[in-house]
UniProtKB/Swiss-Prot annotation:
<dbReference type="InterPro" id="IPR026999">
    <property type="entry name" value="Alpha-s1_casein"/>
</dbReference>
<keyword id="KW-0494">Milk protein</keyword>
<protein>
    <recommendedName>
        <fullName>Alpha-S1-casein</fullName>
    </recommendedName>
</protein>
<feature type="modified residue" description="Phosphoserine">
    <location>
        <position position="130"/>
    </location>
</feature>
<feature type="signal peptide">
    <location>
        <begin position="1"/>
        <end position="15"/>
    </location>
</feature>
<dbReference type="GO" id="GO:0005794">
    <property type="term" value="C:Golgi apparatus"/>
</dbReference>
<keyword id="KW-0964">Secreted</keyword>
<feature type="region of interest" description="Disordered">
    <location>
        <begin position="195"/>
        <end position="214"/>
    </location>
</feature>
<feature type="repeat">
    <location>
        <begin position="125"/>
        <end position="140"/>
    </location>
</feature>
<comment type="function">
    <text>Antioxidant peptide has 2,2-diphenyl-1-picrylhydrazyl (DPPH) radical scavenging activity.</text>
</comment>
<dbReference type="GO" id="GO:0050821">
    <property type="term" value="P:protein stabilization"/>
</dbReference>
<feature type="modified residue" description="Phosphoserine">
    <location>
        <position position="81"/>
    </location>
</feature>
<dbReference type="GO" id="GO:0005615">
    <property type="term" value="C:extracellular space"/>
</dbReference>
<dbReference type="GO" id="GO:1902904">
    <property type="term" value="P:negative regulation of supramolecular fiber organization"/>
</dbReference>
<dbReference type="InterPro" id="IPR001588">
    <property type="entry name" value="Casein"/>
</dbReference>
<feature type="modified residue" description="Phosphoserine">
    <location>
        <position position="56"/>
    </location>
</feature>
<dbReference type="GO" id="GO:1903494">
    <property type="term" value="P:response to dehydroepiandrosterone"/>
</dbReference>
């Protein structure tokens, strides 16, 4: 009789679902104790201490497996959300880097302006002498910005660009217009007067000469 009861209980224990139903509001430890009481309390003579320990270990291992599966699912969800946040941040950094780096076209205008200043064009006397130093520093800044992303625009460059190109556009629409201006320091020569022009010299016997008739 005892063997029959034992086999029935073992069959029931093996037939129970691997994922037990979790009652809301009760912790896992309380549920494990209730299961042990349900199987052990009606038959205290059949189950000894060893059986009770084995059953408690089995139930504890199942609960730990469930918790591990839940932890893995949470970690996967967090990794997906973090990867989605990293992608827009990288796109924003590239967009800021493209906006902050000064264009090479402006540097070409600045070099052209400094070349025109060497010819002493009157409209370019306002350009400061430190423009060459600033051009050199701007070039170094661009090389540094290409290696490392730039967070903000340099205030000195932001102030220097509009002033410089406002003076540059006061010239003609193209740089060759500067050649129409007369450089400073040129000496003008006076035009000869009409009194200094020598009179034409003719022969004295021009009135007496006769033209041959054909």
């Amino acid at each position: 009789m005892k063997l029959l009861i034992l086999t029935c209980l073992v069959a029931v224990a093996l037939a129970r679902p691997k994922h037990p139903i979790k009652h809301q509001g009760l912790p896992q430890e309380v549920l494990n104790e209730n299961l042990l009481r349900f199987f052990v309390a009606p038959f205290p003579e059949v189950f000894g201490k060893e059986k009770v320990n084995e059953l408690s270990k089995d139930i504890g291992s199942e609960s730990t497996e469930d918790q591990a599966m839940e932890d893995i699912k949470q970690m996967e969800a967090e990794s997906i959300s973090s990867s989605e946040e990293i992608v827009p941040n990288s796109v924003e950094q590239k967009h800021i880097q493209k906006e902050d780096v000064p264009s090479e076209r402006y540097l070409g205008y600045l070099e052209q302006l400094l070349r025109l200043k060497k010819y002493k064009v009157p409209q370019l006397e306002i350009v400061p002498n430190s423009a060459e130093e600033r051009l050199h520093s701007m070039k170094e800044g661009i090389h540094a910005q290409q290696k490392e992303p730039m967070i903000g625009v340099n205030q000195e460059l932001a102030y220097f660009y509009p002033e410089l190109f406002r003076q540059f556009y006061q010239l003609d629409a193209y740089p060759s217009g500067a050649w129409y201006y007369v450089p400073l320091g040129t000496q003008y020569t006076d035009a000869p007067s009409f009194s200094d022009i020598p009179n034409p010299i003719g022969s004295e016997n021009s009135e007496k000469t006769t033209m041959p008739l054909w």
